[in-house]
Amino acid sequence: MKEFFRLSRKGFTGRDDVDSAQIPDDLWVKCSACRELIYKKQLNDNLKVCPKCGHHMRMSAHEWIGLLDVGSFREMDSNLLPTDPLGFVAADESYATKLAKTQQRTGMTDAVISGVGAISGIRLCIAVADFSFMGASMGSVYGEKMARAAERAAELGIPLLTINTSGGARQQEGVIGLMQMAKITMALTRLAEAGQPHIALLVDPCYGGVTASYPSVADIIIAEPGANIGFAGKRLIEQIMRQKLPAGFQTAEFMLEHGMIDMVVPRSEMRETLARILKHYQQRQAPAAKADLAARRATLPQPIM
């Protein structure tokens, strides 16, 4: 019997002997909220919302563009490239080097993708921020793409949808990053003058100069459940004020309760909600457009009978 335990286990084909190369590393994803493991395909099929706790995970700009009608998106201003106006160098690397590395890793030129598309057949301009590109920090290209999207929407006479996530202004560009707040907001005034709506969607996280500027003056402000929205972070505020902030502070639900946003919409209902809003605006504008046309016709010279 003792010899049995000395036998070679050479023929054992248990789990430990399975070639690890045959098992992809990204089959499973751990939810950052409930810490449960989720099959990646199941997560993607559920729009990156945890099926166990409902936590909304971050999506890329390209994934958000999936809200649009299939085949309707046409990217604009993809030729805009960021520069290094200050020759900024941090302790470990230069801004130029960091940009190049981030561009190679993400396949994006900067943090925003913009263009023209449609939802339920209704044309609109769209600009989407991607947190994976330097925390979607707002620099010159970010601001220029957002401003051009607003101006294009005004020119075409169609609504603007912005999907916003950010850590704030891009520090490596100094005051140029900060001035994008005013630049985008001014472009949005031209959109308002054209009688077209700006719908802003806030997704986790949305902080700093982005929250403090153009999304907060949108005609309709939507947020995802549990999204963190604010100017400075909760920890920093507590340190400065030296007092504990209320539970749920800076969450989408807290913002809704205090009148800072208009609605909190789960990702599974987002496309349907946006379609309903766009149709509402379209129906409201139709009579106004007819009245405007009649008014312009009235100014034309009348034929002599």
UniProtKB/Swiss-Prot annotation:
A zinc finger (C4-type) spans 31-53. Zn(2+) binds at C31, C34, C50, C53. Its EC number is 2.1.3.15. Pathway: Lipid metabolism; malonyl-CoA biosynthesis; malonyl-CoA from acetyl-CoA: step 1/1. One of its GO terms (molecular function) is carboxyl- or carbamoyltransferase activity. Its main location: cytoplasm. It is found in: Cytoplasm. It catalyses: N(6)-carboxybiotinyl-L-lysyl-[protein] + acetyl-CoA = N(6)-biotinyl-L-lysyl-[protein] + malonyl-CoA. Binds 1 zinc ion per subunit. SUPFAM superfamilies: ClpP/crotonase. The keyword Lipid metabolism applies. Belongs to the AccD/PCCB family. Acetyl-CoA carboxylase is a heterohexamer composed of biotin carboxyl carrier protein (AccB), biotin carboxylase (AccC) and two subunits each of ACCase subunit alpha (AccA) and ACCase subunit beta (AccD). Component of the acetyl coenzyme A carboxylase (ACC) complex. Biotin carboxylase (BC) catalyzes the carboxylation of biotin on its carrier protein (BCCP) and then the CO(2) group is transferred by the transcarboxylase to acetyl-CoA to form malonyl-CoA. This is Acetyl-coenzyme A carboxylase carboxyl transferase subunit beta. It comes from Chloroflexus aggregans (strain MD-66 / DSM 9485). The lineage of its organism: Bacteria, Bacillati, Chloroflexota, Chloroflexia, Chloroflexales.
